[in-house]
Each structure stands twice: as C-alpha cells, then as structure tokens.
C-alpha cells in the first residue's frame, strides 16, 4: 500500500460530507492524486447495502444484522475501490470507516467495541487509516443542522432518539482515546471555512 488513507469521522450533522467536498479540490490543486469516497457506499454493491441500512421503515433491524451489513459493505468497498487507489499512490479521503462501527454498533448499540473491532479486522484484513479526523460536536447541535438542511434525506439512524446520539458521541470519544496515535479530534462547532483550514493543516503536517 503506497497511498495515504484519511478517514473523516463524526456523529450525525458534524459536517463530514461538506468537509470532504472542500478538501478534494484543495488537494487536486496541489497536484495530489486524490479520491473521495464514502461508507457505506462508494461502489454499486455497497450503495445497495447503504439503501437497506438507511431505510426509515427498517426500524426492526437487529443490532448484529446492522453491524454485519456495515462490515460487508466495508469489505467490498475496500477491495474494489480503496485498495486499488492506495496501490496507485492516491490520497483517499473516506467519509466514515471502522471507527463509525465501533461508536455506533460497538458502543451505542451495546454490542461491545472489541467484538465489533474483531469483525472489522476480518472484513478489512487489518487495513487501517493513515490518519483519522474526528469531528466532535454536541448531538443537539448536529441534529439541528440536519433539520435545517432541506437537501439531506433523513435516514433510519437520524430518527433515533437523542439518548442514542449521545451514546454515539460517548463511543467516539472512547475510540479517540483508544487510537490516539492516528485520530485527531477537531471541534466541528465552528465556521466551515475555519474547520477546512484546520483539517488541511493537520493532514499536511502529519502526512504530506
């Protein structure tokens, strides 16, 4: 693996997608081979799994089913899109990766971070990011952003009660502590221009 694998993590409404859309042209202008993608999704099979995971009417989905679907989508996305790009020396910017599963299914769903980590180690063959940016934000602020975003489709996870979203953030903070060697926490409750500037500086200082 020759390229650089950067993942952007955070609770709902933290600004991950908007951030990546801004990072992509910045690094392209620097003559960097760069690719943006997302989880679950990024390729046809994983996008189909994403549709299942996000369907509002699938409220009966059991936690283990959810965890395994995310891991399956991750595996296919990794081997079909991410690894080939890394082998061609790309900077890959990915909206979510393993840490999402640890926070959402491992902690918030109560399945256990160690169990979810082992499932995903198998799915990814121990492929881990070069760097992870965690966008930290209070759940109330993130969910309020979602409500104001008319262009964003509300998914099944958005519909969870506030206690779930608080557990997600708690889970993320534990993940940040556990993997402090590769995860940098950034305050997402700031103007997007400042957030972009801060994240660009982190990526350039640590990787480029």
From Swiss-Prot:
Xref: InterPro entries: P-loop_NTPase, Thymidylate_kin-like_dom, Thymidylate_kin_CS, Thymidylate_kinase
Pfam family, any one: Thymidylate_kin
Catalytic activity entry: dTMP + ATP = dTDP + ADP
Keywords recorded for this protein, A-Z: ATP-binding, Kinase, Nucleotide biosynthesis, Nucleotide-binding, Transferase
Gene Ontology MF terms: ATP binding; dTMP kinase activity
Residue ranges of the TM segments: none
Cellular component GO terms, alphabetical: cytoplasm; cytosol
Record-given protein name: Thymidylate kinase
